[in-house]
Amino acid sequence: MIDFTGKTSLITGASGGIGSAIARLLHKLGSKVIISGSNEKKLKLLGNTLKDNYIIEVCNLANKEECNNLISKISNLDILVCNAGITSDTLAIRMKDQDFDKVIDINLKANFILNREAIKKMIQKRYGRIINISSIVGIAGNPGQANYCASKAGLIGMTKSLSYEVATRGITVNAVAPGFIKSDMTDKLNEKQREAIVQKIPLGTYGIPEDVAYAVAFLASNHASYITGQTLHVNGGMLMV
């Protein structure tokens, strides 16, 4: 049984489907949750479902000062889940420098800052769990998403490097790479598009946000204390590595 009673977790991108599912599960398992994102209205709606033992922290990850301040506000941090990310899709020949930079800045650089600042706190207590949410496309690539794929591949490389650096300090650093997870975005696909994607998934269905949340909870738990520097793929068999 996973029990996070007495632990404090920070979840970024908590206003989205996957982020909110992670926050709800960690909260259900006993953790105090700090839910962060840029959409205060959605964060408040999530908070209403949690009822207690939570804190809302509105943060714009494009602002590096806000990234640093987000961690500094937390006196005791046990679990960090870096889930926030953006897309700005177009073919590489049409992609402007700023389209590439803004995705890298939020999906990779901001998450590096959060990891770095969290590690500083976790080293003091010689305990910590960091989970970075990557993507199937960080391994497989995807046309029209050179910026997004680069950012998600970078997260995996960063996760491995950091796991080496802090392994002797009681801190584990892992990644979760979701495949196609049911969301508002997938709901907008037409039936033909949905069927084409499902045909590529051996389990024959989209995942749900809770599938990712349970993977995160496992990696954050003591059951995964001997696992670090790894990427847990949650994709229904769409990519087997």
From Swiss-Prot:
GO MF terms, alphabetically ordered: 3-oxoacyl-[acyl-carrier-protein] reductase (NADPH) activity; NAD binding; NADP binding
Domain of life of the organism encoding this protein: Bacteria
Matches recorded under PROSITE patterns: ADH_SHORT
EC number of the protein: 1.1.1.100
Catalytic activity: a (3R)-hydroxyacyl-[ACP] + NADP(+) = a 3-oxoacyl-[ACP] + NADPH + H(+)
Residues reported to bind NADP(+): 13-16, 38, 57-58, 83, 148-152, 181
PANTHER family on file: 3-OXOACYL-(ACYL-CARRIER-PROTEIN) REDUCTASE, 3-OXOACYL-[ACYL-CARRIER-PROTEIN] REDUCTASE FABG
Subunit structure as annotated in this protein's UniProt entry: Homotetramer.
Family named by the database record: Belongs to the short-chain dehydrogenases/reductases (SDR) family.
Summary of the function given for this chain in its UniProt record: Catalyzes the NADPH-dependent reduction of beta-ketoacyl-ACP substrates to beta-hydroxyacyl-ACP products, the first reductive step in the elongation cycle of fatty acid biosynthesis.
Protein's name in the database: 3-oxoacyl-[acyl-carrier-protein] reductase FabG
Species of provenance: Rickettsia typhi (strain ATCC VR-144 / Wilmington)
Record gene name: fabG
